[in-house]
Amino acid sequence: MNYLKTIGSFALLLAVAGCNPNGPDPGKGKIDPKYEGLVLNEIAAHEETQEFDTWVEVCNASDQPRELDGLGLYITDQFFKGQKIADLSGTLAPGERKVFSTADETLVTGFSSADPFTLVLGTDKDIVADSFECKADDPSLGYFASYQRLPDASGEWRLVTYSSQGKVNELFDLSKTRPTAVWAWGSHMSDLLANDGAKLKELKAKGYDHLLLNYSAFDYPTNKPLAKRLIPMCDELGIAVHAWLQAFYDGDWVSPIDDAKKAFKEEIFERIRTDAARYIEQWGVKGIHLDYIRFGGTAYKHNYTQEVNSINAVNRACREVRETCDAFEEGIVTSAALMPEANSSEYYGQVPSQMAKYIHILMPMIYRYGSYNMSDNTFKSNSNYFAERAAAGGGVSWSGIQTYDANTKGLSAEKLRRDIDLMAETNASGIVLFRYQLGTFPDVNDLWN
């Protein structure tokens, strides 16, 4: 068979029938009132890889039911010109949305955000309901990013680093979550994912809404496949994943101050900013958590000028991470781990009230067992100290709680709940448990509702 001749003959038949063989033209297409209000609402253009699907969400933004029969999705890119890649059918109620995906083959091929493309919702008779154009200079999508209309179904298009497939398009809002978090290592992901995420689902059911996931989950090659499974599962459950990065530590303490030059080490601050941006862009995390955002007990040895000193080094890193997160305009949250001693800036360079000018959530590690051996009163007093300093700087404090005793034996749910209740009696706005896989986590659904 002469394939080219057959294609040419088919195109001629379409033209005679009043059909456009190149699909509807978004610049010239007509509008049919029966499709009014049907819009392309969200697009994840990940080509057609083994790990990530391409999908398109169509939404009915009108106040009337709309028939989809006769509509299709048409792609024009470096490979196709007006190629139909989906046949639509059925009815969408007002506000209802439907996803077409390569995962279930309702979308017959993927397309990539790395190259220009135009997607049209329309018919082969030049009826255009809506269209979207990805231009050559537009940034490509990260693993979990998508192009979205914001506000949902009516606003302008923008790239968002996390998607909302099948849900209302909206930016992350910390106030809509519970102030309950867990620190987890990259090595914990296998356990969290086992049995279809049974333990992850249990965490959510018990009232924990945030997961502070160590940088190794994103950076270690053996962990990346697990992170690619864990993050969408967390999104589906309503658990916000924060990337937990190490600021002034890389297997050993890394001073952000060059003592010989009495100047900041610019490469340290650049690395922190770059890592934060990379975790957001590539992984779609909802927060950046700074650990080791301090000196290892020797801050007083690095104070040289009014500008170059340990406190300013810590504050600068906090400020630059906040600026990096805010630049995305996606509600990305900043948090930081603090040492639990009051008035300890001489040793760590941490001044909570100053850090809270840039950090949304201070997370003091108020670990009562072991070397600190805190009484109930000291435990609560330390929590109040950080809560008050956080508030003075415009932030909040979630008290970090140890889930194991002095012998690294996990606490029972009853004992851990007692410590949590003590923190709930203070001015702390939430809790963070250290760490996953140690201790039995109690139900906390009754707290901070």
PLM regions and their residue ranges:
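Intrinsically disordered, low-complexity linkers and terminal tails enriched in Ser/Thr/Pro/Gly
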Residues: 19-176
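Boundary/entry segment of secreted carbohydrate-active catalytic domains
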Residues: 173-199, 203, 336-340, 402-404, ...
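Aromatic-lined carbohydrate-recognition surfaces of secreted/lumenal glycan-active proteins
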Residues: 181-185, 242-246, 311-349, 394-405
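Active-site-adjacent "subsite" loops/lids of carbohydrate-active enzymes
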Residues: 182, 190-192, 226-232, 240-283
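Catalytic domains of carbohydrate-active enzymes, especially glycoside hydrolases
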Residues: 194-219, 282-287, 361-362, 426-430
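Active-site groove signature of glycoside hydrolases
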Residues: 212, 271-308, 432
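Substrate-binding cleft/loops of secretory-pathway carbohydrate-active enzymes
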Residues: 333-374, 408-411
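Substrate-binding cleft of secreted/luminal carbohydrate-active enzymes
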Residues: 364-379, 386, 393-449
